[in-house]
Structures are given as structure tokens and as C-alpha cells.
């Protein structure tokens, strides 16, 4: 991230923002001049082709929000040799002592197990908590990653393609659950129909610029074609 210029919240409704910011990674500037405001309570979908800067923007937003944001990364970042339960539990490692975490690794805490079991059931993972993550399907692993983010119990959900490995019907249900459990959501997606159906603001990115920023109810899938047009 390079020369990130942030905007201090000016009103109670202001959550985060960038004012003529330069954002990038590995000495590569992705956004040379980004201005963006995000308000509390918004449901925002980031759309655009691969490589246009969605992940860069989410990383900058995560840095700005700190422990307000629950993070669900694109690559899941799960520990393959640990169980689904332990991967979900990792969402709240910082809430427990090192000793408690070590004991839980050997013998799951009863209260944590019950809470995570209830969460897993809502995500269709019941019966899979003891299974190693590397023995789960791609869609199941993605739901474990979502469960870990939900278990963090933070007001803002930040997701990088959190439903990319599930079918549209499952994706819709997962997005409903994510929206129900968080006051604010900012999610990168590639499924435009899901974005229009489950988010109230669409931000379209291309070549380091915001080229669409509009209420979802004012847009159709065809309006988003410009985001995916060949160079």
C-alpha cells in the first residue's frame, strides 16, 4: 500500500473513506487518485474484472477499519491440517489467552463448541466440524471461511469473493446471512446478479478508477457490461 490518504470520519454516519489517495502494493500503484466515502449501514458490492483493484481497495479498507472489520479473504487462508472447528475458532483467537487457545486445540472448549456448532448449522456445515479442512470440498471450505469471519462478531464484514466457490442459490443464502449479522458490508463479487439483489450500492472499478457508483436499484445487469468489456 502506498501513500494511503485517509479521511477522518466527519459525521456519525461516516465509517471510512479515501481522499485523493494513492493505493497500491509491492511498489505498484493501482489507484493513483482515489476518492471514496463509505457510510455506516451501507451494503456495498465491488465489481470489475480480475486485477482492477478490488483486493487492493479491500486491503486499504481493512487497514483503516482495524478491529471493526471481519475479514473473509479470497484464498480462504484456512489451515488445511486443522479441523473445521479449529479454523472457525481462529476467528476469535485474540479474545482468549494463549493458554486457553492451547487447551482448546487439544480439547475443544464446551461453550465455544456449542456456539460454533450452532453457527455451522446455519451454514450447512453441521456434522463436518471434526473433519480436516483439506478433506472438505471447495464450497465447504468457503463456508468455513465465512463462518470464521462471522465468529469474529465485528460490525463490518469485508469479503473478497466470499461466495465464488458455491452455486448462485447457496451464494444468495450466504450473502443474506452475512448481511443479517453485520451492520455494514463491503464485498468484492463477480456475480452481478447477486450484487444487484443483495447490496444497496454498486461500485464498479476499471483501470484504477471508479467508473460506476450508484444505488443497486437504479442498475440492471446490462448496465454493468462496461465493467467487463475487453480492453
Go through each PLM region and give its residues.
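Catalytic Walker B motif of ABC-type/P-loop ATPase nucleotide-binding domains
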Residues: 157-160
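Conserved ABC ATPase "signature" region
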Residues: 102-128
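H-loop/switch region of ABC-family ATPase nucleotide-binding domains
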Residues: 189-190
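Conserved ABC ATPase signature
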Residues: 132-136, 140
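Q-loop/switch helix immediately C-terminal to the Walker
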Residues: 82-103
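Hydrophobic anchor residue at the start of the ABC signature
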Residues: 146
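Conserved beta-strand-loop-alpha-helix hinge in the C-terminal portion
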Residues: 209-231
Amino acid at each position: 500500500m502506498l501513500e494511503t490518504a485517509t479521511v477522518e470520519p466527519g459525521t456519525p454516519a461516516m465509517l471510512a473513506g479515501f481522499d485523493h489517495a494513492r493505493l497500491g502494493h509491492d511498489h505498484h500503484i493501482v489507484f493513483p487518485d482515489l476518492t471514496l466515502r463509505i457510510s455506516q449501514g451501507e451494503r456495498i458490492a465491488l465489481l470489475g474484472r480480475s486485477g482492477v483493484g478490488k483486493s487492493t481497495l479491500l486491503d486499504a479498507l481493512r487497514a483503516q477499519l482495524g478491529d471493526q472489520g471481519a475479514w473473509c479473504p479470497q484464498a480462504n487462508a484456512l489451515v488445511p491440517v486443522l479441523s473445521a472447528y479449529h479454523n472457525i475458532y481462529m476467528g476469535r483467537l485474540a479474545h482468549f489467552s494463549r493458554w486457553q487457545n492451547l487447551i482448546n486445540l487439544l480439547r475443544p472448549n464446551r461453550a465455544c463448541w456449542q456456539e460454533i456448532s450452532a453457527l455451522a448449522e446455519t451454514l450447512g456445515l453441521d456434522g463436518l466440524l471434526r473433519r480436516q479442512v483439506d478433506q472438505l470440498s471447495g464450497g465447504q471450505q468457503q463456508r468455513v471461511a465465512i463462518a470464521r469471519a462471522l465468529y469474529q462478531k465485528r460490525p463490518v464484514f469485508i469479503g473478497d469473493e466470499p461466495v465464488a466457490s458455491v452455486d448462485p442459490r447457496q451464494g444468495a443464502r450466504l450473502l443474506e446471512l452475512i448481511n443479517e449479522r453485520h451492520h455494514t458490508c463491503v464485498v468484492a463479487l463477480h456475480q452481478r446478479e447477486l450484487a444487484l439483489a443483495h447490496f444497496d450500492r454498486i461500485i464498479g472499478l476499471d483501470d484504477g478508477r471508479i467508473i460506476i457508483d450508484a444505488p443497486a436499484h437504479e442498475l440492471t445487469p446490462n448496465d454493468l457490461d462496461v465493467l467487463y468489456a475487453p480492453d
